[in-house]
Amino acid sequence: MATYHATTDSDKLCCHKKAAPVNSAKISLIIPVGPDDSSWNSLLEQIALFQAWFAEIWLITTSTDSADFECWTRRFSDSEIIHWVHTIIGRGHQLNTGARLATGSWLWFLHADSRLSHDAISALSTALQSDHDSIYFFNLKFETDGPTATRLNEWGAWMRSHWLRLPFGDQGLCMSRETFERLGGFPENVPYGEDHLLVWQAHKQRIPLRAIPATITTSARKYRSDGWFRTTIRHLWRTAAQSLPQLVALLGSRLR
């Protein structure tokens, strides 16, 4: 696999890539990978089953060790669609980097610890054929690697995303390139909640958010390692702290 170096305004990228024609009607899958995160291996195992459906797969990582990735390229029938990119730490920056490099007309931002199903892929495929202007998200389910109390968090995520129209990044946000560019990308100057702030920006621009009638699963390991109550309260507090000024700004723009 060939290697090249590309330079952006903010950093240098090291990518493992082969040039390949891409069907722009397909999806570019963008997966940010954090330091010492190996959960993407299990995700790629699932993605390999649906690889024909993607224009390309971008793993945007802060690690320079691509040994495991090189092994994965041999498990894809077309190794040219999967790419490994090294960039600086920061989830918002990683997501924007993937979007800049992607060539598909649809951008699907997926967490490395997400788990997919055939039903989820099929439901998203159907939805994308009917509406090109919305941001799509899935229902959320937690894996069994955490406390059983995370079932309450699933319920809370459903209410937040369906009633308040505030889905988070672990619900697999997918949108057209035009919509992403209209939003201006993910904010990079925040310590957390870049996905949350992007959704608020969508509300300000009256961009619809639509639920996919399917579920993706995410890891509950943080609820186990940090404690269910502590983690839940921390998420609620951070969400409220970010939401209040955004809500005030949204109401202000509506009243002008």
Residue ranges of each PLM-predicted region?
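The conserved acidic donor/metal-binding loop of glycosyltransferases
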Residues: 111-115
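Short beta-strand/loop segment that forms part of the nucleotide-sugar
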Residues: 31, 44-45, 53-65, 85-87
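Short, well-formed alpha-helical segments that are part of the catalytic scaffolds
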Residues: 35-50
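Short aromatic/hydrophobic "clamp" motif used to bind/position activated sugar donors
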Residues: 107
